Design a protein with these regions (language model features):
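Sec-exported extracytoplasmic/periplasmic mature domains
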Residues: 1, 5, 22, 30, ...
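N-terminal lobe/hinge region of extracytoplasmic solute-binding protein
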Residues: 1-21, 51, 137-140
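A structural "hinge/loop" feature
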Residues: 9-13, 39, 61-62, 108-118, ...
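Aromatic- and charge-enriched surface segment that lines or borders ligand/interaction sites
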Residues: 15-65, 98, 188, 235
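Periplasmic solute-binding protein
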Residues: 18-36, 102, 110-112, 220-233, ...
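Gly/Pro-rich hinge or "lid" segments in bacterial periplasmic/extracellular proteins
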Residues: 72-75, 80, 86, 94-95, ...
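Extracellular/periplasmic solute-recognition and catalytic clefts
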Residues: 147-158, 175-233, 252, 256-257
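Structural transition elements
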Residues: 264-286
Length: 286
């Protein structure tokens, strides 16, 4: 699945799907979906990839995500209690994928837009092992494929002519530059060396917004910043203390006076810009 600019779920490799109980989902894959080497993208590719993601031998840092979906047996497989072959995923045919959950999850289709559930090319992974992501080996099924990768210097992507929606791809090449220093990144942007940056030094933000209003745009970021504390120990094991602390924090001072880059006060863990999320503001936030 993919997401549009507003965060709404839209078809990706799966052109349609259905469920009657929010526990068993059937996804119908596009017959014209291909890997960058020309191989067809099949339901079996997803079966292999999901099993690989939960396999303890893979040690995926995002295996928890499949557990969060409640995919059948995912939790036990990750914990080493069951074999990966028991995962609730099955290829009904080359273009039909069945996924079974342990609990009804109405938003499951939305969860299928996460990077963790994107398929990997089995033949490439099995041939090259931990070297499968090298530019000379990599095979993907997205709009771009990895062309060059110099660690800590640059990553270059080129257009994938075999992508199922290639006719709507408008950029032929994308280069990512890993720049740790925000001031250096800002200067390279101002000099025209890079076209897009999503970070600006806090102390320069207001000046740049005034001097380059056409370039500096503030858009919502789907994340939440929060203070964490141990609620298993006193005094934070008392819900009244936790509420008092929340009431005492002036979120507007933090967002407007300290950060001042368009952040909004948060009264929910889920960002307000999340598609379909329409919360009622708590009394202390009004």
């Amino acid at each position: 699945m993919n997401q549009d600019a507003a965060g709404n779920t839209i078809p990706g490799v799966a052109e349609s799907w259905e469920t009657t109980d929010n526990k068993t989902f059937i996804f119908h894959l596009r017959k014209n979906a291909k890997w960058s080497n020309g191989d067809p993208v099949t339901a079996e590719d997803f079966v292999y990839s999901f099993k690989r993601a939960v396999d303890p031998a893979t040690a995926s840092p995002y295996s928890w995500y499949l557990e969060m979906t409640t995919m059948e047996n995912a939790a036990d497989i990750i914990a080493g209690k069951k074999d990966k072959e028991t995962l609730g995923v099955k290829a009904l045919d080359a273009n039909t994928l069945e996924i079974k959950l342990e609990s009804a999850v109405p938003y499951f289709v939305k969860m299928m837009g996460h990077t963790t559930v994107k398929p990997v090319h089995r033949a490439t992974v099995e041939k090259w092992g931990d070297q499968w992501t090298k530019p000379d080996h990599f095979v993907g099924n997205g709009a771009y494929v990895l062309d060059k990768w110099v660690v800590n210097e640059r990553m270059e992507l080129k257009r994938n002519p075999n992508y199922w929606d290639n006719e709507h791809t408008v950029i032929n090449k994308v280069t990512y530059l890993p720049i740790e220093n925000q001031v250096a990144e800002m200067n390279r942007f101002l000099s025209g060396e890079i076209q897009i940056t999503n970070e600006l030094p806090l102390e320069h933000f207001k000046r740049l917004q005034k001097e380059h209003p056409e370039s500096v745009q503030v858009q919502g970021n789907l994340c939440t910043y929060y203070y964490g504390f141990n609620n298993q120990k006193a005094p934070f094991n008392d819900v009244r203390i936790r509420k008092a602390l929340s009431y005492a924090i002036d979120r507007n001072i933090i967002t407007d006076a300290i950060l001042g880059q368009g952040q909004k006060p948060a009264y929910f863990l889920t960002p307000e810009i999340t598609a379909g999320f329409h919360p009622e503001m708590p009394a202390y936030g009004r």
